[in-house]
């Protein structure tokens, strides 16, 4: 019998990548969840991927999630810290805002009789830094959901994918140099030689989730990192110039210059303790995934 996969956040970067990859396999029935399944983003995806069922769901409404998960064998779950309603709740003291949405996904999936959940999670920076940087809320919330799901392993199978450092961030970090009005500066609060497991979210997430679903026994209860390997932060600037021919440079800026203690702690932790805590085992294992992971060079080439 063809298995049904319900995809949370199907119009987002991660969810749409999962939708694309699973649809390409032709092996699954797909149900796409969105707060607005009749919106423009959903319409664009509907035009690309036929045969997908679209349903409304709100991560704050467990009843809507239970309904959306009915009959599904697997749920792909993802939460988003950097959205207006979550940020506002955090500003008003609700530091568990993202965790609560993730918990709702888990609880609703169990109530609907779902067999397994593939959860987009990440390491706890508090744990990686041995308590030095406890305030990276968009890491802590996701990891807390992972711990909650793990504690319920007798009720639902848990699989975990950890995305690397978003290459898309470097687009946001870029500016035209005020010195010559020509050079592209990548202003980042990281040491230029800090090694990052880079990922193109839209291109690399889906193939990894597809791999997890194809290898359920091997991946059960484990972490599968979503990246092809480590690169120095400054490599993104070097690759930009190589691909475009435009002058660029990497500029390390102070941690406190970004106006966010939460992000400042994240960058400090990555400089000191490494993204993924410096783990490298995934590089060899990910060669088994039939996917060419994005590199700094291919990222800029793909952006035209």
Describe each model-derived feature in a short phrase.
Residues 219, 244, 254-304:
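A hydrophobic C-terminal alpha-helical subdomain
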Residues 250-251:
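Double-stranded beta-helix
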Residues 2-47, 60-63, 68-70, 77-99, ...:
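Oxidoreductase cofactor-interface core, primarily capturing Rossmann-like NAD(P)-dependent enzymes
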Residues 57:
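Cofactor-binding loops of NAD(P)H-dependent oxidoreductases
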